[in-house]
């Protein structure tokens, strides 16, 4: 009976509570970021992308996932390595695939209670991609990681006004 209760609670699970992933994700070309401000609490309070355009990323059903590990630095504070995996649901777009394979990007991701930014200091660069016509509907996945040879990223949140301005411009 306990098994049935668990299945029932999984079916009735409220996906909007923030434990199941991100509700919105935007990808920004690192080169489009003209300036940003991070306050003492490690919150991004300003982000200027000039005429750059943020792109919406599908975040449902593992379409966007993040992992973070600590990079131990000798003679400098430890920092984080961000690794972001994105599923591209568009199958036939050579221009998009080539841009992603050569990109240097930043991601802003919204959960129900907070918003995070990944790759703000150094950008995230492609480290892997996978396209298999026989698996997962033939979709492609791309993995972006903090570059080697840099200190790493801080754990940063994003102020609501910054989040709103970026997501209002998403295409």
Residue positions per predicted region:
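Solvent-exposed edge beta-strands and adjacent loop segments
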Residues: 2-81, 124-135
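Short, hydrophobic/proline-enriched secondary-structure or compact coil segments at domain edges
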Residues: 20-31, 84-88, 104-112
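Extended hydrophobic/Leu-rich segments
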Residues: 33-36, 44, 86, 163-170
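Oligomerization/assembly interface segments of phage tail-like spikes and tubes
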Residues: 68-93, 136-151
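Short, acidic/charged, Gly/Pro-enriched secondary-structure junctions
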Residues: 92-118
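Mixed-charge, glycine-accented linear interaction segment located at domain edges/termini
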Residues: 120-171
